[in-house]
A protein has these predicted regions:
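Charged, compositionally biased N-terminal leader segments and the immediate start
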Residues: 1-35, 48
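S-adenosyl-L-methionine
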Residues: 105-147, 155-162, 186
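Conserved proline-anchored active-site loop of SAM-dependent methyltransferases
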Residues: 133, 147-160, 169-173, 309-330, ...
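Class I S-adenosyl-L-methionine-dependent methyltransferase module
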Residues: 166, 172-291, 328-362, 367
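Conserved SAM/SAH-binding loop
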Residues: 301-306
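Conserved Class I SAM-dependent methyltransferase catalytic core
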Residues: 359-413
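Class I S-adenosyl-L-methionine
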Residues: 399-445
Length: 445
């Protein structure tokens, strides 16, 4: 993937477009700085320039001066002033808030150093649609239990958590399962203990470490060599500590690592490829996950079609993959970090042998969905769908059509269809004119 020039990067992957689409939490510090800068300099696009600045000043960024910035080749007075003005504005609001005693506006040290559930990049993430989905559920469905059978990031379950007495999350990716365990599980854990371990990890200097499995394979590609050493060291250390950790503490540390990795990965948000001519962000920093408050929760990592045969619920939310993008392949590095089996890797993208390949990403998708719907023991089915079946990208072509879903659900009960204009992840070849997100709601007869 040669993306040395900003114009070579698909629009949806550029900082401004991603900010508008997914919000600030989906962007790294260098992405946010790129938006402030607006444009690059001779021979260096804005993302490369922003990464260079963040990498150079690191944690001292908020204390830089115009003279500091002018020492970077190509940075003129105007760009230096843009950055310093933005920093000064933030400091001014912070200081004024503190002097007026508005402590509610100022995050505590621990809150400031935390990860929210939605703070990661993920294809098909429903974070910006969660309120819309919830509003329809409130109006159209009733019951006490909610099953998110293809839970993905878990943001839909998080949004409805206060509405239901029981939440059931399922996803067959090891990395998503780990995230649910950290954010949703009600197991015992010592927050101070995990916080101090994370602080210990954040003090590590990658230059002091030897190369390891992770740095030898992914350093200088998906991550800087230094960050890759830290990632590998931390993952090894978490495993060494496992006997002294509760299950919840173990997954809190694993999830903190996964989210930290996502923030600095030299990619567009997945691991199907990496940028070959873009500077790698070298600001590795773990944070504590902020738990989701839920009354009762069950967490599974199973084939959805098998789980459907034995776990009942009042409402099931179904959001399977509809195209050929295999999530186990797109997020193979996160899967490896959770399993920590250090597999043999293949190809330019450095992927392990195939595992957890979904039938919903194949021509069998329609039959698998029909089987799932038939076997579910629920009162209401809620199905998300988007119209990328008109895509020019082969990987985005839907394996199931709108009409096929409607036909499958009609056999189960009366169905209503809701729609909303919404733009999804795009590799640059899809025409998003009139693009919509659909929500099917079926009351089982």
């Amino acid at each position: 993937m040669n993306m040395g020039k900003l114009k070579d990067i698909p629009k949806i992957d550029r900082p401004r477009e991603r900010f508008l689409e997914k919000g600030a939490d989906a962007l790294s510090k260098s992405d946010l700085l790129a938006i402030v800068l607006g444009s690059g300099i001779q021979g260096k696009n804005v993302q490369e320039l922003a990464r260079q600045i963040i990498q150079k000043f690191g944690k001292g960024f908020l204390n830089i001066t115009i003279d500091d910035l002018r020492k970077i080749a190509g940075i003129g007075h105007a760009k230096a002033l843009q950055i310093i003005a933005a920093i000064s504005l933030v400091k001014r609001f912070y200081q004024e808030g503190g002097s007026n005693g508005q402590t509610a506006l100022l995050l505590s040290r621990k809150e400031e150093n935390s990860f929210q559930l939605q703070n990661r990049r993920y294809i098909g993430n429903k974070y910006k649609l969660a309120d819309w989905i919830f509003s329809i559920l409130e109006k159209e469905c009733s019951g006490n239990s909610f099953m998110d059978i293809f839970a993905g990031t878990g943001v839909v379950s998080a949004r409805v958590a206060t509405r239901f007495k029981g939440i059931i999350l399922n996803d067959f990716l090891h990395s998503n399962h780990a995230v649910y365990k950290a954010f949703f599980d009600k197991g015992e854990w010592d927050r101070e203990k995990t916080y101090h371990i994370i602080e210990e990890y954040n003090r590590i200097n990658g230059k002091d470490l030897k190369d390891c499995y992770f740095s030898k394979n992914f350093g200088g590609k998906y991550f800087s060599r230094s960050s890759a050493r830290i990632i590998g060291f931390v993952r090894d250390d978490i495993e060494k500590r496992k006997n002294d950790l509760t299950e919840k503490e173990y997954y809190v540390l694993i999830t903190s690592l996964l989210y930290a990795v996502d923030k600095i990965a030299n990619t567009v948000g997945h691991y199907d490829a990496y940028f070959k001519k873009v500077l790698v962000d070298d600001t590795f920093a773990m944070r504590s996950p902020v738990p989701i408050q839920v009354e009762n929760v069950e967490i599974y990592r199973e084939d959805a079609n098998l789980l459907a045969k034995r776990i009942p619920a009042d409402i099931v939310y179904i959001d399977p993959p509809y195209n050929s993008r295999q999530y186990s392949r797109f997020y193979h590095i996160l899967e490896t970090l959770v399993k920590w089996d250090k597999p043999k890797l293949y190809g330019t993208a450095l992927k392990p042998a195939e595992e957890n390949m979904s039938d919903y990403c194949r021509t069998t998708a329609k039959d698998k969905l029909a089987e799932l719907v038939r076997d579910l023991n629920v009162k209401f089915l809620v199905v998300s769908y988007n119209n990328t079946y008109a895509s020019k990208s082969s990987s985005s072509l839907n394996k199931i059509t709108h009409d096929e879903i409607a036909g499958i659900l009609a056999k189960k009960g009366a169905t209503k269809v809701f729609e909303k204009d919404y733009r999804h992840f795009n590799a640059g070849n899809t025409n998003f004119n009139n693009h919509k997100e659909f929500l099917f709601v079926t009351k089982v007869k």
